[in-house]
């Protein structure tokens, strides 16, 4: 996923989930935050951030959208739409080794009472396999270990359990955690934050759902799905 034009700024404060105050070229601006999660460990007053410049769109309420933040020397993308886009591109370009011989890939497909991020079809040795992928973006990191979620997510738990049902019905089910940074070498479930979600993922992994974690290469104007990262399911 590539951004058209990106500028730098200094984060000042976040009045609510949707907007932030950022200093850009010496002027304080109200900007859109492309992530409604808490991100408290990232959005600390004074940190450097990157913003997508949207001034060429006259219909926008704000001129900029906050997309990335530096945590020390590590650049973390926090755009909640980016993991889905990066995964879609990587799968389409056959860069995800777990999904090969792709014949069809589609976004936002309904199954049961849920809408999964991606639907795909593969053809191996004449056998057609249909499947769903649910993508979760990961921004919470501590000492090289990433965790999800950073806030309770009933909706996320529902998606995971629906994926188990899809597998029971013969579909291939994949839960893909996209770590929106490069560097961490382990992904863990955040049992302390959301035990129900963590239990659901553990249950899913034991009942046919493929749980994957990939890091990402983060450039100032781009996010590219990277390498597979080990998963620790333990509480």
From Swiss-Prot:
Name of the gene this protein is made from: sfsA
Gene3D superfamilies given in the database record: 2.40.50.580, 3.40.1350.60
A Pfam family: SfsA
NCBIfam families: sfsA (TIGR00230)
CDD domains: SfsA-like_bacterial
GO MF, any single term: DNA binding
Species name: Alkaliphilus oremlandii (strain OhILAs)
Protein name, UniProt field: Sugar fermentation stimulation protein homolog
Annotated family: Belongs to the SfsA family.
